[in-house]
From Swiss-Prot:
The keyword Cytoplasm applies. It is found in: Cytoplasm. GO terms for molecular function: ribosome binding; translation initiation factor activity. IF-3 binds to the 30S ribosomal subunit and shifts the equilibrium between 70S ribosomes and their 50S and 30S subunits in favor of the free subunits, thus enhancing the availability of 30S subunits on which protein synthesis initiation begins. GO terms for cellular component: cytosol; membrane. Monomer. This is Translation initiation factor IF-3. It comes from Shouchella clausii (strain KSM-K16) (Alkalihalobacillus clausii). InterPro entries: T_IF-3_C_sf, T_IF-3_N_sf, Translation_initiation_fac3_CS, Translation_initiation_fac_3, Translation_initiation_fac_3_C, Translation_initiation_fac_3_N. GO terms for biological process: ribosome disassembly. Keywords: Cytoplasm, Initiation factor, Protein biosynthesis. Belongs to the IF-3 family.
Amino acid sequence: MLVNEGIRAREVRLVGANGDQIGVKSKHEALEMAQRVNLDLVCVAPNAKPPVCRIMDYGKYRYEQQKKEKEARKNQKVITIKEVRLSPTIEANDFNTKLRNARKFLEKGDKVKASIRFRGRAITHSQIGRDVLERLAKECEDIATIEARPKMEGRSMFLVMAPKTEK
């Protein structure tokens, strides 16, 4: 952001402190007008012909901009993907533990990637793994939507669920 002497243009379109159009003035005149009211001359549109400059308190303006950026960062939600690993021959209690973890992640607002790794000859029975993932998805369907249906990648099968958004 160009301020006061940092402005290189000879002529500028000047906007007053309260937002009124003053007109096209020389840079020197605009600087004098800003200094008379103890404010800064700030170039708000440097690419315009002639550049648009405004008389304002630059310190206050920068503070407001930083406050807006901080507020915007605070309101951003970072979505992370949590992984729950299962096996095709998972027992009931182990499945319930994994289900509880998946539901906890979804309720927190994170996406869940459920994966099954097939070891050895278990890959020949990939339907068993698909059934386990489908069962997990069915148990979570009240709080989650399925983003990616179960699919094989190498020796693993994946399912991605995202939390349902409230409207």
